């Protein structure tokens, strides 16, 4: 859908993988991977969705 999809946020207690698999957030920022977007969402009031796979 055009609004984006929620990131799949598994338990990130162990930290995020270093694998570069970029996703474009609905905030216009490119995140290194879905997990890093999840970590950012934990700091926000309004979660960022994934607009598309790949860099913005």
Curated annotation (Swiss-Prot):
Subcellular location field: Secreted
Record-annotated Kazal-like domain positions: 3-56
Coiled coil: none
GO cellular component: extracellular region
Disulfide-bond pairs as recorded: 9-38, 16-35, 24-56
Site (Necessary for sperm binding): 20-21
One Pfam family from the record: Kazal_1
Site location (Reactive bond for trypsin): 18-19
Molecular function terms from GO: serine-type endopeptidase inhibitor activity
InterPro entries: Kazal_dom, Kazal_dom_sf, Prot_inh_Kazal-m
PROSITE patterns reported for this sequence: KAZAL_1, KAZAL_2
Alphabetical UniProt keywords: Disulfide bond, Protease inhibitor, Secreted, Serine protease inhibitor
PANTHER family in the cross-refs: SERINE PROTEASE INHIBITOR, SERINE PROTEASE INHIBITOR KAZAL-TYPE 1
Function: Serine protease inhibitor which exhibits anti-trypsin activity. In the pancreas, protects against trypsin-catalyzed premature activation of zymogens.
Protein name as catalogued: Serine protease inhibitor Kazal-type 1
Organism of origin: Equus caballus (Horse)
């Amino acid at each position: 859908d055009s609004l984006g999809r929620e990131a799949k946020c598994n338990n990130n207690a162990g930290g995020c993988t270093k694998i570069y698999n970029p996703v474009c957030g609905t905030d216009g920022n490119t995140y290194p991977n879905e997990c890093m977007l999840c970590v950012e969402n934990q700091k926000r009031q309004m979660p960022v969705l994934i607009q598309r796979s790949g860099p913005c």
